[in-house]
Amino acid sequence: MKSERPLVEALQTFVEKEPYSLHVPGHKNGLISALPKQLKKALLYDVTELTGLDDFHHPEDVIEKAQKLLAETYGANRSFFLVNGSTVGNLAMIYATCKKGDTIFVQRNAHKSVFHAIQLVGARPVYLAPQWDEHTNSAGAVPFETVKEALKRHPEGKAIVLTY
């Protein structure tokens, strides 16, 4: 069975054409810097919304196909690739589910962008404590029982953020 990789294949086809970089990002495929060879190779694939590569802000071709494959893989209705990393995803998720005064359950050791989004939207956080993992000497997941208890105490909750 051949796996489908529409975005990867489009990037490979683009790079094989050895195009001149007259667009952002400014590293120009790694050519104008003294970076290690392997990193320069990776930068060949760091391209923006160019012909044949689709557009993350409005996918209609290879990115749309890749997002559909990802959704299918995880049994989700839809899947979205993010621009600007996890921060934009956390902001979008909280803005889409909460408004001022809404209750949101949040893992106490979540990414700082989660707390930023909660503050920006004006939601009211209910903090969920993660278990301490003695093996790794770090915070682990929030126990299921903790989540159930929080939902009982605050049935008005609009969203829950568990990031680890």
Cite the ranges covered by each PLM segment.
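N-terminal "arm"/small-domain region of PLP-dependent enzymes with the aminotransferase-like
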Residues: 1-61
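Conserved N-terminal alpha-helix of the aminotransferase class I/II PLP-enzyme fold
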Residues: 42-88, 109
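Well-ordered alpha-helical segments embedded in enzymatic catalytic cores
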Residues: 65-69, 89-93, 113, 142-149
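Conserved beta-loop-alpha segment that forms the PLP phosphate-binding cup at the N-terminus of a helix
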Residues: 78-101, 117
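Substrate-binding/gating loop at the entrance of the active-site cleft, primarily
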Residues: 106-123
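Short beta->alpha connector loops at strand-helix junctions that form conserved
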Residues: 107-108, 127-132
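Active-site phosphate-binding strand-loop segment of PLP-dependent enzymes
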Residues: 136-164
